[in-house]
Amino acid sequence: SLEANTGNKLYIQDDLRGKNVDAIKALAAEKKVSISWTPKKTLSDMTGGAVHQGFVLRVSEFAYSELSVIMDKAEQEENPLILILDGLNDPHNFGSILRTADATQVTGVIIPKHRAVGVTPVVAKTSTGAVEHIPIARVTNLSQTLDKLKEAGFWVFGTDMDGTPSHKWNTAGKVALIIGNEGKGISANIKKQVDEMITIPMSGHVQSLNASVAAAVLMYEVYRNRL
C-alpha cells in the first residue's frame, strides 16, 4: 500500500528498530507519508487485534473501479474471467479471494453495494496488496449487471451442490463466475440468471468448502485451462 501511494500516515511501533524499519522510513519519506511512533498496544487496538508486525498504514478511502472499466479490460483479453461476489460478508474471505484472483489473472471483481463487505483495511491486509492490482467495481443492482455481462457475450456460471463437475467445466470464451454468500449461497433471484451451475467434486464427510477455498479452486480451473 505504501508503494501504491494509497497511504497518508504510517504508525510504527515505538520500540522497533532495524534495517526493515530504516527501509520503510525511507520509502515513507519518498512517498511523503508522515510517521507516528506509537506504542504496540495502540497499534493492536487500531487493527482490532490483527497481526501488524509493528507497522500500521492509514490509507485513503479505497478507489473502486467503474463496471465499464472492467468490461473494457475484458474486451482486450482473449479469455476474460470476471468474478462476482454475491453477498460475501467475511472480510478475510474477500481478501483471500482477491489474493487468488491476482495470482490467476482475473480480469476484475464485482461486488454489490448493499448487504456485502466492501474493501476494508482487513480486506486489504488479507489480500497482501492484491487490492491495488485488481479492478473492483461496486454495483447497486447485481441482476442488471449480469444482464450487461450477458449482452457483452459472457457466460454466467454459479456454484452449487448439484451441477457440472468442475473438471468437466467448459471455460472457453468470456466467463463470469458467481461466488455466493458464506451461509446462504447464491441468492434466488441471481440463480435464475445463471447459465450453468458448477460443483466441486468432494469425497469426504463435509458438505461444502469455505467460500474463499471454493473460489480459489474454480479460479485455478479457469487459469489452468488457459495455460
What is each PLM-predicted segment?
Residues 1-72:
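N-terminal positively charged helical leader segments and presequences
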Residues 80-128:
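Hydrophobic, well-structured mid-protein blocks that either form specific transmembrane helices
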Residues 89-96, 141, 209-214:
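Amphipathic alpha-helical repeat scaffolds
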Residues 125-128, 188-227:
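Structured adenosyl-cofactor binding patch, chiefly the S-adenosyl-L-methionine
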Residues 13, 39, 86, 112-113, ...:
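Short beta->alpha connector loops at strand-helix junctions that form conserved
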Residues 107-161:
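Histidine/lysine/aspartate-rich catalytic loop segments that bind and position anionic ligands
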Residues 116-122, 184-193:
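Short, glycine/polar-rich helix-capping loops at beta-to-alpha or helix-loop-helix junctions
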